């Protein structure tokens, strides 16, 4: 199957005839190849609620009727915006949907949005483990390095791992490479969350040079096959 990258942390895939998008940051994302007014999906899965991840969720969900999967707080926030089709999950939950299973796992980050000068708490930030038939995708979300990445990988060995490398807000190159080499050990590593803003500009090739497993550097609209 093919998993497509769309800049920052946004990925899409299709399984069992259902289309899934993760963290649909499209408008305002200079690297995105998608159009929020035409993208068609059945599910929107969110790691957390920062603007570069929540992105265009509200507009896409209202237009398409896609089910939004996120933390309870994030689902409640979206319900208040008129998004009716949501499924709340939390860390440790592992639910079978018609496209496959989603498990919410830890990520070490923050999770809020600011509206009219008010900070709104949106629950714990998360990583995601997708089990699609015999294939496993680990999307780390936004996170620093933490040792239980090894436990997540032992429970769910990943065919592909989407790992943030941009530093400043998440792991940088050195920590991300350590996570891949020593903790997660996926078959393929795909760097994400870099070069979208000045704060997170890094040399992606330096990450590839430090990683022992196969690295797939994707431009927006390109895919990795598992």
UniProtKB/Swiss-Prot annotation:
Family annotation (InterPro entries): Metallo-B-lactamas, RibonucZ/Hydroxyglut_hydro, UPF0173, UPF0173_UPF0282_UlaG_hydrolase
Keywords: Hydrolase
Keyword Iron-sulfur: no
GO MF annotation, one: hydrolase activity
SMART domains membership: Lactamase_B (SM00849)
Pfam families from the UniProt entry: Lactamase_B_2 (PF12706)
Superkingdom as given in the UniProt entry: Bacteria
Cleaved signal peptide residues: none
Family stated for the protein in its record: Belongs to the UPF0173 family.
Protein name per the record: UPF0173 metal-dependent hydrolase MCCL_1373
Source organism of this protein record: Macrococcus caseolyticus (strain JCSC5402) (Macrococcoides caseolyticum)
């Amino acid at each position: 199957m093919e998993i497509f990258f769309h800049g920052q942390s946004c990925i899409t895939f299709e399984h069992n005839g259902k289309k899934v998008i993760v963290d649909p940051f499209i408008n305002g994302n200079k690297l995105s190849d998608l159009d929020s007014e035409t993208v068609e999906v059945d599910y929107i899965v969110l790691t957390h609620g920062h603007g570069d991840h929540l992105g265009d969720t509200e507009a896409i969900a209202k237009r398409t009727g896609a089910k939004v999967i996120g933390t309870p707080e994030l689902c409640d926030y979206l319900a208040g915006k008129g998004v009716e089709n949501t499924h709340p999950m939390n860390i440790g939950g592992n639910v079978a949907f018609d496209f496959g299973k989603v498990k919410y796992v830890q990520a070490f980050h923050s999770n809020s949005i600011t509206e009219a000068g008010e900070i709104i708490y949106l629950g714990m930030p998360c990583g995601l483990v997708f089990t699609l038939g015999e294939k496993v995708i680990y999307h780390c979300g936004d996170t620093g390095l933490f040792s239980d990445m090894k436990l997540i990988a032992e429970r769910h060995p990943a065919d592909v791992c989407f790992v943030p490398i941009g530093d400043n807000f998440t792991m940088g190159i050195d920590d991300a490479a350590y996570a891949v080499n020593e903790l997660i050990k996926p078959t393929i590593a795909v760097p994400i969350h870099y070069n979208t803003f000045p704060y997170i500009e890094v040399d992606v090739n330096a990450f590839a040079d430090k990683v022992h497993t196969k690295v797939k550097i994707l431009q927006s609209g390109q895919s990795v096959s598992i």
